[in-house]
Amino acid sequence: MKLVEGKYYHFKVLKTVNLPEEGDHYMLRHKSGRRLLLPAEPYNNYCIGVNSTIECKVDKINCTGKVFLEPRHPVYIEDKIYDFTVHQNSVKDINLNETITVHDVFNNEVQVNWPSNKSKLPEIGTNIKLRVDRLTNGVPILNI
């Protein structure tokens, strides 16, 4: 069976394996029998266990045919809006871009570009609504 970028598929978690110099991975099996590896470290908070079934999006298939999967996030859904608390504001860089830093539900720091046409940066501790554009390695990519 051919996997298609952007589509979700169910995979059974067969076991965890340790690859030298690459760390722990989940060995997954699709119903077609195809086996794939998923790095474990980015998804420590996902409660993925051996013999469980997880739903993953085919994030990318590179030119050599390697498939990159992104498990469905336990909290965030792409293109939905969520509240985040501002933890840090940045100074303008040489291109006059500003950023804010928020934390996701697993306390990952996420930087968000603040448009120059918006009013002033929100204050630290302020709650703001941000859209989850996509998820990469368990961390949301956020947008205003």
Where on the chain are the PLM-derived regions?
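Single-stranded RNA-binding regions, centering on S1/OB-family and related RNA-binding modules
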Residues: 1-144
